[in-house]
Amino acid sequence: MSVEHATPVQQPAHAAASVRPVMILAGGTGGHIFPGLAVAKVLRARGVPVTWLGADGAMETRLVPQHAIQIDTLAISGLRGKGIVKLLGAPVRVMRAVRAAGFVLRKRQPRAVISFGGFAAGPGGLAARLLGVPLLVHEQNRAPGMTNKVLSRFARRVLTGFPGSFAGEEAVGNPVREEIAALPAPATRLIGRGGPVRLLVLGGSQGARALNNAVPAALAALGHPAVDVRHQCGEKLRAEAEAAYAQAAVNASVEPFIADMAAAYAWADLVVCRAGASTLAEVCAAGVGSVLVPFAAAVDDHQTRNAEYLVSAEAAVLLKQDGTLAVRLQQVLQTLLADPARRLAMAQAARTLAKPDAAERIADIILQEAGNGKSGMGNGQSTEQLQEHTVIHQNKRTDQALDAASASLHPIPDSRFPIRTSAGGAQ
């Protein structure tokens, strides 16, 4: 495939053209992409340009350009669950992707690279390491993803959303939207609040069928208590969720998407939701108690690991997704709906876990490492010096696979790289 050249995206007016960018590696899911976008916003506000490396056709190719960030993509996909034939060919595909990523890094000349996870993060991180560009990792979940596990072995700094993911980690938290972090303290919002208990149900962008079925059934079994329900269900499952509430004769506001999540958290007395890293970061930042139902099919059961962190602080209740979910949810709601003091205690416990300045801290650390380079492209060399720099500095612990990737990083005609380039535009 040939390289597609694009007009460079316009950076903010205060970002000097001579300032080298930070490269973000993130994609595949919103859980990887949105933290990267939050950090990109902070960096750009400080006058630091940002460039992005993702995978062909993945979610990031739609989301990132909306923020006026230039994105390059690699022809790479995940390896888990592949057949034996494809797995046998994986090393060759990975080496090609590392080689292509090396070409992108030489072209963009980033001062530092940070991986938030995703298909392209592996090749991009390996190429950064081999070219001597300062590499950082941010892992959102307590159970690390495969890519970040590998990259953590030779990253300059390993940052985490929750403590307990890696030895030598720095638990900086997961970035959240400013308006959520700015919400008043739980006591200010909840003490003295009258009327029905306000129950916020979050199924995520794709919705959660288990919650669509269990919440209406649990509320109906409780004899229709004084509860106001606001249920975010995703567009695809909206009709299904509305039908479930109608069948249970439970009044609820069913919405495919909630644009103002800060207002939704401020409204809520209790949240029922999945246990993705970004959602839990928001629940903690807002300061609201929660009933967590981890997605049963999540890779490495990482949502359960995330939920256990809040449960250990008495900020949440954990319910396993199985055939008895509705019955157990009924029992939990029966207790919590009748106990405002416990709901407040859970909300306050959640708030103590919050790290509202996570995006700022991550940006600080990136720029610290960008100024601490000793070799390669991350050491503040001029563009002319970078163009002349062809020696790849390798660590003695680099294994044979990295050696092979290193050998493939020497300049090759553009037409041999499976790369796509697009310029983001403000929309």
Swiss-Prot record:
UniProt keyword terms in alphabetical order: Cell cycle, Cell division, Cell inner membrane, Cell membrane, Cell shape, Cell wall biogenesis/degradation, Glycosyltransferase, Membrane, Peptidoglycan synthesis, Transferase
Reaction it catalyzes: di-trans,octa-cis-undecaprenyl diphospho-N-acetyl-alpha-D-muramoyl-L-alanyl-D-glutamyl-meso-2,6-diaminopimeloyl-D-alanyl-D-alanine + UDP-N-acetyl-alpha-D-glucosamine = di-trans,octa-cis-undecaprenyl diphospho-[N-acetyl-alpha-D-glucosaminyl-(1->4)]-N-acetyl-alpha-D-muramoyl-L-alanyl-D-glutamyl-meso-2,6-diaminopimeloyl-D-alanyl-D-alanine + UDP + H(+)
Chief localisation class: membrane
Binding site for UDP-N-acetyl-alpha-D-glucosamine: T29, G30, G31, N141, R177, S205, I258, Q303
SUPFAM superfamilies: UDP-Glycosyltransferase/glycogen phosphorylase
Matching InterPro entries: GlcNAc_MurG, Glyco_trans_28_C, GlycoTrans_28_N
Catalytic activity, EC: 2.4.1.227
UniProt cross-references to PANTHER family, sorted A to Z: GLYCOSYLTRANSFERASE, UDP-N-ACETYLGLUCOSAMINE--N-ACETYLMURAMYL-(PENTAPEPTIDE) PYROPHOSPHORYL-UNDECAPRENOL N-ACETYLGLUCOSAMINE TRANSFERASE 1
Family per record: Belongs to the glycosyltransferase 28 family. MurG subfamily.
Name of this chain's protein: UDP-N-acetylglucosamine--N-acetylmuramyl-(pentapeptide) pyrophosphoryl-undecaprenol N-acetylglucosamine transferase
Organism: Xanthomonas campestris pv. campestris (strain B100)
Lineage: Bacteria, Pseudomonadati, Pseudomonadota, Gammaproteobacteria, Lysobacterales
